[in-house]
Amino acid sequence: MLSFLSSNLSSTRQSMAQVLNFALVLSTAFMLWKGLSVFTASSSPIVVVLSGSMEPAFQRGDLLFLWNRSPRAELGEIVVYNVRGKDIPIVHRVVRTFPQIEGKAKKVKEVNEASSVPPNMLLTKGDNNIADDTELYAKNQDFLHREEDIVGSVRGYMPMVGYVTIMLSEHPWLKTVLLGIMGLMVILQREQ
């Protein structure tokens, strides 16, 4: 009877150790993500290119690293933005900037040369698209506001690394297969 309790207690300890290790891995990943978010000043410091609208600069599945500490976006800079009301990041290039004066976007000709107003309003376009992004913006929105809509500016990338997340979102059955394989690995590792 004592040997039964001893083996049962050791398997319980082993199970608890595995649960704690798993919790440690999850909390470490979460802390790294939040730390990176604070460091880059971006709610999403790493994003995946979901379409071919920025080809040839970025391909579908490229992993982008963002930085959001610049007070303004420059002409030609590649930015990631979210459309108001939707949570899908869009990666496009800034093709026009407009200074904001008295709460309204003014055309560059309307601002005198001596004005030091930073450009806050942006117009974007995908490199592979014919037209600008005004059709993608929220209803009654003609420009992106730098502080409100921009998630970050692209500072680096890794080609094709993000394709795994695209595959998992496009093929839900693949998630089930991967979870099954991971569960099987845990069971097989326990038996050793």
Swiss-Prot record:
Residue intervals on the Cytoplasmic side: 1-18
EC number: 3.4.21.89
Lumenal membrane side: 40-192
Residues annotated as transmembrane: 19-39
This protein's name: Signal peptidase complex catalytic subunit sec11
GO-annotated biological processes: protein targeting to ER; signal peptide processing
Membrane topology qualifier: Single-pass type II membrane protein
Entry's Gene Ontology cellular component terms: signal peptidase complex
Domain note: The C-terminal short (CTS) helix is essential for catalytic activity. It may be accommodated as a transmembrane helix in the thinned membrane environment of the complex, similarly to the signal peptide in the complex substrates.
